[in-house]
Amino acid sequence: MLKVGSSLLAADGGGLSPRFALGLAQFVSANLAAGRELVIVSSGAVAAGRAILPKAVDVGAPIAARQALAALGQAQLIALWQRFFERAVAQVLLTHDDLRNRRRYLNARATLGELLRLGALPVINENDTVSVDELKLGDNDNLAAIVAALVDADALFIATDIDGLYSADPRSNPLARPLDDVPELTPEVLAMAGGSGSNVGTGGMRTKLEAAAKAGAAGIETYLFNGRSGEVVRALAQDRLRGTRIHAARTRIAARKYWLRHAPVEAGAILVDAGAAMALSDKGASLLPGGVVGAEGDFRRGDMVEIRLRDDEGERCLARGVSQYSAVDIRRIARRHSRDIENVLGYSYGENVVHRDDLVLL
């Protein structure tokens, strides 16, 4: 899995440049020639669209305007990658809903698997044109990590505009030292991350480490390298790392539990009391309506939500899971016994608000 940011494809702040992408394309070609399967997650649609209509919008423009630029630029982005390879390049556009909904998530996995079986090169991007959440900081870094787990990748390579992770921001601190090997992403390591310094893309080093943590939970190592350096990319194509290796977690979680933990969450939460929190964390129980005190947001049945403990100290997130009932229904059955659900609602989807098989503790 290779993730490429827009700052590497439009490094002069203008449109996409084959010159900037050439080294990365050679890295891809070397891996394909070695018989490896590869998937690319590539940003750059907004930057390409901005070059088509340079006076249309600034970097900090409203989401709707940037989405329009993405619509203009996505074809340019795919054309850029297609020109480097003799094999077919497949465009795959995903949204948070595709990753949050279990059925669509599995459909995406099946499609990507078939593309790889056919010998195609999938190039993935968020569907910027319709996805409101897409244009948040670092989204494609996290997308790359989730897709890496989706296709059961061996490794995640994240091309950035510096030489990897440093002990401090090397642009502002001359004493910053490079870290070539990170056995574990501790809070101290995360604190070392600074911004990328680029005004072309939206991802900083912090989001790249968050992506590495997500990939690591699926047993996937992450490599951060300087995608602008021809020497670094050529070395990488020969399996010689010049950058930062971030080890995978020691314990790999099951595929379904991974999805529950890392899929984008619906803007909503189920609020529970201390007794329910103890049953979830200590006994591995399902969440029953009797321990529910309320619901936040307007989520629907089948949506991924957070499960939060509400007590005198406030709220804190305990778990994530797939709700069997909508927020409206949960407010009506909160504090009720499971046997009362049908009497209150006029129907029942079962005794559990969230079944333990559809729940993961955080």
From Swiss-Prot:
Origin superkingdom: Bacteria
Pathway entry: Amino-acid biosynthesis; L-proline biosynthesis; L-glutamate 5-semialdehyde from L-glutamate: step 1/2
Record has Cell membrane as a keyword: no
PROSITE patterns, alphabetized: GLUTAMATE_5_KINASE (PS00902), PUA (PS50890)
Subcellular location: Cytoplasm
Major localization class: cytoplasm
E.C. number: 2.7.2.11
SUPFAM superfamilies in the record: Carbamate kinase-like, PUA domain-like
Residue ranges annotated for the PUA domain, each copy included: 267-348
Keywords, alphabetical: Amino-acid biosynthesis, ATP-binding, Cytoplasm, Kinase, Nucleotide-binding, Proline biosynthesis, Transferase
Record-listed substrate binding positions: 43, 128, 140
InterPro entries: AceGlu_kinase-like_sf, Asp/Glu/Uridylate_kinase, G5K_ProB, Glu/AcGlu_kinase, Glu_5kinase, Glu_5kinase/COase_Synthase, Glutamate_5-kinase_CS, PUA
Catalytic activity: L-glutamate + ATP = L-glutamyl 5-phosphate + ADP
Residues binding ATP, per UniProt: 3, 160-161, 202-208
GO biological process: one example: L-proline biosynthetic process
Nucleus listed as a keyword: no
Molecular functions (GO terms): ATP binding; glutamate 5-kinase activity; RNA binding
Single GO cellular component term: cytosol
Pfam families for this protein: AA_kinase, PUA
Protein family per UniProt: Belongs to the glutamate 5-kinase family.
Function as written in the Swiss-Prot or TrEMBL entry: Catalyzes the transfer of a phosphate group to glutamate to form L-glutamate 5-phosphate.
Protein name (Swiss-Prot/TrEMBL): Glutamate 5-kinase
The organism of origin for this protein: Xanthomonas oryzae pv. oryzae (strain MAFF 311018)
Lineage: Bacteria, Pseudomonadati, Pseudomonadota, Gammaproteobacteria, Lysobacterales
Gene designation: proB
